[in-house]
Amino acid sequence: MFNLEEELKKLPAKPGVYIMHDKWDNIIYIGKAKVLKNRVRQYFQSNRNKSAKIVQMVSHIQYFEYIITDSELEALVLECNLIKEHRPKYNTMLKDDKSYPFIKITVGEEYPRVLFARKMKHGAGKYFGPYTSAAAVKDTIELLCKLYKVRTCNRNLPKDEGRDRPCLNYHIGQCDAPCQGYVSGEEYRRRIDEVVAFLNGDYKKIMDRLTTQMQEASEKMEYEEAARYRDLLMSVKQVAQKQKITADDVNDRDVIACASDGQDAVVQVFFIRQGKLLGRDHFHMKVAEGDSKSDIISEFMKQYYGGTPFIPNIIMVQYEIEDADTIAQWLSARKSRKVSIVTPKKGDKEKMVELAYKNAQLVLTQDAEKIKREESRTTGAMKEIAGWLGLGTLHRAEAYDISNTNGVESVGSMVVFEDGKPKKNDYRKFRIRTVKGPDDYKSMREVLTRRFTRGMREREGLEDSHGFSRYPDLIMMDGGRGQVNIALDVLKELGLNIPVCGMVKDDTHSTRGLYYNNIEIPIDKHSEGFKLITRVQDEAHRFAITYHRSLRDKAQVSSVLDSIEGIGPVRRKALMKHFLDIEKIRQASVDELMKADGITENVAENIYKFFH
């Protein structure tokens, strides 16, 4: 079971993305943090100063997970991509599906433009980003225009040269008007090269220049101008920060890294699409003696890419693998396009592989703890129950319940738990045949008698096997002394010896304890055994009442339709097959009713008049 306090203590003091799940494993919120430890803990502190939405979201959190990154900027971009992928319920602020902006330089033009772009189109120019602040990108473009006098207009140059007067940017000193021939193509290209160099990270010269201009303006007491340079300098620092979480091209690629503890291995895959990290997944691998991480990755690739429909252009792996060329040829044949397998040795790509490895190591550690928690809530819980009852072993348990409405459509349910987990293939349901009226004791006697008589006949080979021949180590009755005694009587009559306990409830219909060997055994409500008993009890009730309601609804439909002149079993079945439920039949017109098989105009009119 997920222990919130313990997991909060383990949060790292690193940037990353956190992912909140509800009890059905749905992702309900994704966020980013500069320091995961501080940000995630804030959700589980006092509700004071929290919005109603956050309070509600926190109330639905069952567990959380996280992905570590190397910077807050990387976390922001990853958060955006994951939210696009999963669209969590509580991330309402990002419903506009806005993408982070790029700076685009139309390098294919004779006089390239520096533009703001939301989408990246292959072959349409040179892109830088994505960046996290649209305002910073616009400020940076404005800065570049002021420093290098490059254009941002849509004029077709040199075709439109001299056709119109210079635009406003020329008059405010942000463009040297190549549209008028005021700057040569060679000089303009040199300026564009400097812009590209700046956006590639060579921005020290510009920052020094801005700093000098800011100081000079301050010394001249031109404080507004100094503040403007200061703000632009801050924007440059933000825009110029590099992020390895985004690749420098739009090639689709997977990044694969492996972590192993010698017994188990986790392979982490980062999925980079159109140059952006869209998500990640991890896979468990069985480790054979002598397997290296290179062997594990090689085997993973053969199994994974043999079953996935999409193969990226480039696969970046943590270690060089012996059969890389063969695997690459195989994948290239499957994709009908060259696939490269590379092992980065330096730069951002190596750091990206290292980041995948860190997350693989994190998953390996978390999964080891998760396995322990799962064992505690399943096999561990069964051992607790066995200990309370003094049973040697407890592998399989069956639980029974009865459901009816004032004795109408009475049914029984049998649910099975093995090693603390529901085994739904072995569930059985019983329609009560011999009992009239609401008598749960007699109904339970019939269910148990039928179940174990059928089991005995299957064991003797007198009937085909339908799963009844396997007996439980424990029978769990929904109730106390009365229900337990019914079960013991049935077993005694059939000559069977199976332990029986009752799941006793209090006045609020909540589980209180176990009734066994004529005594009620109190149990710790915080124990895993108690929680398992509650799950068993709830599942038996759910399975019984679901079956009962389905029979009751069918009976109500049959009763209503049978009251209509001209409707017999065949036409009733045809109507239900066509309309699916009684309400749609009630709302249908005469023409719509006649579309069902066997429904004539006269019969359709009878049905319509009956409901109207």
UniProtKB/Swiss-Prot annotation:
PROSITE patterns: GIY_YIG, UVR, UVRC. The keyword DNA repair applies. It holds the Pfam family UvrC_RNaseH. One of its GO terms (molecular function) is DNA binding. GO terms for biological process: nucleotide-excision repair; SOS response. GO terms for cellular component: cytoplasm; excinuclease repair complex. It comes from the Bacteria. It is found in: Cytoplasm. Residues 204-239 form the UVR domain. Residues 13-92 form the GIY-YIG domain. SMART domains: GIYc, HhH1. Keywords: Cytoplasm, DNA damage, DNA excision, DNA repair, Excision nuclease, SOS response. Belongs to the UvrC family. Interacts with UvrB in an incision complex. The UvrABC repair system catalyzes the recognition and processing of DNA lesions. UvrC both incises the 5' and 3' sides of the lesion. The N-terminal half is responsible for the 3' incision and the C-terminal half is responsible for the 5' incision. This is UvrABC system protein C. The lineage of its organism: Bacteria, Bacillati, Bacillota, Clostridia, Lachnospirales.
